[in-house]
Every structure is written in C-alpha cells, then in structure tokens.
A protein has these predicted regions:
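Glycine/proline-enriched, intrinsically flexible loops and inter-domain linkers
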Residues: 1-247
Length: 247
C-alpha cells in the first residue's frame, strides 16, 4: 500500500501534480524495484493499493495549475518512495527547467544533476535522473541556432567524506547571452538538500545566479523570472545526489 495521506493541499502555484502523474511516478519506482524486464501496462499497478487524498497536491481539483507537477513534483514523489523503501538515496530531485527567448528565438532545456547512491554503488554525476526523460541539445547545435555561447559545462565538485557510497555530483552550466532575452527557471532543492540514506551525506543544494555585463551578480531563487541582456551570463549549479551508508 502506498498511502499519501498527509500530503499538503492544493498549491497556489503550478506545482500540483494530476493523479495520472502521481500514478506514473509510483509505477516508475516499483518497476525499478522489480529488477526484471516486465511489460509496461496497467497490470503493473494491480498489486499496489494507492491512497491519494482527493484535492491534495497529488490529485488537485480543476482549475489547479499543474505544469510543475509533471516536471518537479514527480521528482519529489520518486525520491520519497526510493527513500521510504530504503533502496536509494535522493537524486537531485529537480529537472532544473530553463527557458529563455525573445521575439526571434525560444529555447527550453532540463539540466542534469547528481544521482543518489545505494547499497553497493555510488551515484552517477551530471546525469538526467528518474522522471526527466529528456536529453540536452548539443552545444554546437545550440550555439549555431541561438545567440548564446556555452562558457562552461562541467561537473561540480562535491566532497563526500561521510558516506560509504557517495552521491553523484551536480553540473555547472554557464551561458553567455549575445542578445536581450527573457528567462524563466523552474527548479528545486535550492534550500533543502537531497537527503542521504542510512547515514549517508546529503547532496549539495543547487544554486543559480546572473552575472551582469558590468560584473554585478544577482542570486536566483528556485523559481525565477528575469531579463537578460547582451553580455550577461546565466550560471546554474544543479543539486547533487545523496550518499548511502557510513564508512
């Protein structure tokens, strides 16, 4: 039985997850735990009893906004279930949804981060995790099609001396803008770290900032909208995964 009783009520923003998204996240987790190649169909959920309170964050009533429920809340569901079963420490827990554009250009990407560790294995660094289901545009194609330059795309340093099996590190992505654009960021784990498991260290929290052309820096919240001008840089550091066990 998977009982979501006690879940918060409908979110005033757009982090509400339709019931179908909640069911999909549960299905994903338990198919991972089976450890065998089984067909994907409705029968996978038959052995499970789901209790999802009507009207809550995970089954909101119309006209609740739901866009972030698919890309962000679904990640929270998977992390919660893997932690509850003791199978896996938390992964980055967000898709780091980034959109930017102007009258001529529009672009959307999700940015990779750290995966959680488990009993006998470390977490992978700078990978798409769990519900993301997407890849990133090649740098060469992105720079050819849009007036931006990727200054840096690397793995963050994440020191973990507390865990027997360390979590994966997040990524650092720096984008230089050559034209004025509007930017939106929809992300998570900027304040609360992705939890470790069985005494393992928590993953690093994510960070974001704008470095203006004159050198001034502006810190970004997890959910943010901002105007970017030619010469500005956007720097996103994604969360790391939690570690597993004590040495």
């Amino acid at each position: 039985m998977i009982d979501f009783t006690g879940t918060s009520g409908r979110h005033e923003g757009n982090f509400n997850a339709p019931k179908a998204i909640t069911r999909a996240a549960v299905l994903y987790v338990f198919r991972c735990l089976v450890g065998a190649d089984i067909p994907l169909n409705d029968g996978c959920l038959k052995p499970l009893r789901l209790i999802i309170p009507e009207g809550c964050l995970l089954d909101p009533a119309f006209p609740a906004a739901v866009v972030a429920g698919n890309v962000e809340t679904s990640q929270a569901i998977t992390n919660a279930l893997f932690l509850a079963t003791g199978a896996l420490a938390a992964s980055q827990g967000t898709m780091n949804n980034l959109t930017f554009g102007n009258a001529r250009h529009q672009y959307y990407e999700t940015i990779c981060g750290g995966a959680g560790a488990g009993n006998g294995f470390a977490g992978a660094s700078a990978v798409q995790t769990h519900m993301t289901n997407s890849r990133m545009t090649d740098v060469e194609i992105l720079e050819k099609r849009l007036p931006v330059r990727i200054d840096s795309f690397s793995i963050r340093e994440q020191k973990d001396s507390q865990s027997l099996w360390p979590g994966g590190a997040g990524a650092l992505r720096s984008i230089l803008f050559l034209e004025d654009m509007e930017m939106n960021l929809l992300s998570g784990h900027r304040t609360i770290a992705p939890p470790g498991l069985a005494g393992g260290q928590d993953g690093a929290v994510g960070r974001g900032r704008i470095i203006r052309a004159d050198g001034e820096e502006e810190r970004l919240d997890a959910v943010e909208q901002a105007s970017l001008y030619a010469g500005d840089r956007l720097v996103i550091e994604t969360p790391g995964g939690g570690g597993y066990g004590r040495p």
